[in-house]
C-alpha cells in the first residue's frame, strides 16, 4: 500500500503533529507500506524543496512547501510530487491552527480538492474546535463555532473514505454533527532508550537546586514531571495540596520538574515557583534531545498531564509518559462531553480525585512499551477496511 502523509509542517522538533506524522510514516514503512511526506504550509522553509527525513530508523522522502507561497503554486508542486509514483491513499493529518493562526480554515477544501483528485482520502482530526470546556468565554465559543463550520465544510467537500480522531470525546462531538470517526489514540513521540543514562539529569538538578540532599536516598524524594507545553489555564490546585499532604505522610521531599518547551506557561511557572517554592523544589530543563527526554521520563516518579481527562487521548506528551511506564496524573477535568478520553482506561493514568494522596505512595511504574508499531498496524488495517467498503459501493 502506498500512502502519502500530508501535514502542515515538517520541521523536526518544532511541530508536534509533524513529528507524529513522520513517526507514523516511518512505522508504516517498516511494516511494508510505501510512505512519503508532504508539508503543505511549512513556516520553516522559504522555497519549495525535497529532502530525506529520518525517523525511527527509516528514511522517508519529503516535500516541504513554504506557507508564504500562493496556494496554487503549492498544490501544483504537491501534485507533481505525487504523480511520480501514484499513491493508494492520501492521509491528511489535520490541525486547524496549522493552516490559520486562529484555526479558521474556511476555503481549505477548495485548495485541497485539486490535490486529492480521485485518490482515496484518509483524514486524521488532531484538533476539532475550541469553546467546549466548562467556563469557555464568549469569544472562545464564537471562534469555536466558526472552526466547527469550517471543519464540517472541509469534510463535506473532500468526502474522506476514512476518518480518525484521537479520543472518544472528539468522536462524540463529530457524531453530534453527523460525522462518524474511528478512534486512533496517539503514540508517544519519544522512543524508549534502553539503559538510559541519567547522569546529566542529576548534574542539572544539582545546579538548579532541585537535587536531593547528599545523604538522602533517592527513595525519599518524589519527582513529578511536566513534558512540553504548560497551558496558561492549567491550575496547580488542588493537585499540589494533595501532593504536599501525601509527601508529608510518606516523609518524602518533592521536586517539580519540566522538560521541553513550556510555551504559554512562563508566567504560570513563575507563579508556582513563588507560591510553592518553600514546599517543593522546582527545575526547568528546557529543550533536550529525544534520548535525554527518554532518560528523564525513566528517572522521575510521576508524570503530570496538562490535557483534560476527556481529551487525554490526543496528548502526545501523556502518551510518551505512558510509553515509558510512568504513572501519569491527570488534574484537569474541565471538558464534559460525556465520553472518556480513551477506549480502554490505562492503569497508569490517574484521574485526580480526593483519593490521590492515598494513591501516590502505592503507585508503581509499568513496563516500557512500543505503542507506535501497534498504532501503525491499526491505522493501516482501518484504511484497508475503509478502502474495501469504498470499492463495494
Go through the PLM ranges and name each one:
Residues 7-12, 26-84, 170, 261-266:
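N-terminal strand-loop element at the rim of the active site
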Residues 7-22, 45, 98-103, 232-236, ...:
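A short, glycine/small-residue-rich beta-strand->loop->alpha-helix junction that serves as a flexible
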Residues 110-117, 141-162:
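Membrane-proximal helix-turn-helix segments that form the acceptor-binding/catalytic region
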Residues 122, 130-154, 169, 190, ...:
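Nucleotide-sugar donor phosphate/pyrophosphate-binding loop at the beta->alpha transition
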Residues 132, 152-183, 188-195, 267:
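A short, active-site helix/loop in glycosyltransferases that binds the activated sugar's phosphate group
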Residues 205-235, 257:
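Conserved donor-binding/catalytic core segment of Leloir-type glycosyltransferases
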Residues 258-260, 267-291:
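Nucleotide-activated donor-binding/catalytic signature segment of Leloir-type glycosyltransferases, i.e.
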Residues 297-312:
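Acidic donor-binding loop of glycosyltransferase active sites
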